[in-house]
Curated annotation (Swiss-Prot):
Any one GO MF annotation of this record: peptidase activity
Segments on the Lumenal side according to the record's topology features: 36-172
Catalytic activity, as annotated: Cleavage of hydrophobic, N-terminal signal or leader sequences from secreted and periplasmic proteins
Class of the enzyme per the UniProt entry, highest EC level: hydrolase
EC number(s) stated in the UniProt entry for this protein: 3.4.21.89
UniProt region (C-terminal short (CTS) helix), positions on chain: 158-169
Localization annotation: Endoplasmic reticulum membrane
GO cellular component entries: signal peptidase complex
Catalytic site positions: S49, H90, D115
Residue spans, topological domain Cytoplasmic: 1-14
Family to which the UniProt record says this protein belongs: Belongs to the peptidase S26B family.
Database matches in PROSITE patterns: SPASE_I_1
Protein name per its UniProtKB record: Signal peptidase complex catalytic subunit sec11
Length: 172
């Protein structure tokens, strides 16, 4: 069963194939990031704050190419809050001013109040630079795997172990 490991050349080929898969995935991610002009072109909805528009586990595709274009009320955006790692998906409900320095107020469709409590300390509004991208497409529930992996860390270990086992046992 592990006879493939006895041959160093075959083991090296398997290791290189695994590295090729990882580097291809990374290059695809970076390519999509450049095309969409977004550091995170694909995000997963982590909470129910945007229901019924988006459910927990929906996979969202972002577009940020029109940085100079006006952001409009009603647009669903993903933004980062200074000091927090997790991006937030919410709708723009109010806009004050025009251009890149316009002040934007967001709110989740399923939330009672706006997002001022979520913003960084001393921040009352968002500006265009806080926005990672606007949602232009989504796939329902596909991102639920990400949620399961973050809520159950042992699943990561099991999946990585299975992937490693497949690479080791793979025959050319």
């Amino acid at each position: 069963m592990l006879s493939g490991l006895a041959n160093p050349r075959q083991a090296a080929v398997q290791l290189m194939n695994f590295g090729l898969i990882l580097s291809t995935a990374f290059m695809m991610w970076k390519g999509i990031s450049v095309i969409t002009d977004s550091p995170s072109p694909i995000v997963v909805v982590l909470s129910g704050s945007m229901e019924p528009a988006f459910q927990r586990g929906d996979l969202l595709f972002l577009w940020n190419r029109n940085v100079l274009a006006e952001t409009s009320v009603g647009e669903i955006v993903v933004y980062n809050v200074k000091g927090k790692d997790i991006p937030i998906v919410h709708r723009i409900v109010r806009k004050f001013g025009k251009g890149p320095e316009a002040k934007l107020l967001t709110k989740g469709d399923n939330n009672v109040s706006d997002d001022t409590e979520l913003y960084a300390s001393g921040q009352d509004y968002l500006v265009r630079n806080d926005i990672i991208g606007s949602v232009f497409a989504y796939i329902p529930f596909v991102g639920y795997v990400t949620i399961l992996l973050s809520e159950h860390p042992w699943l990561k270990t099991v999946m990585l172990g299975l992937m490693g086992l497949v690479v080791v046992l793979q025959r050319e």
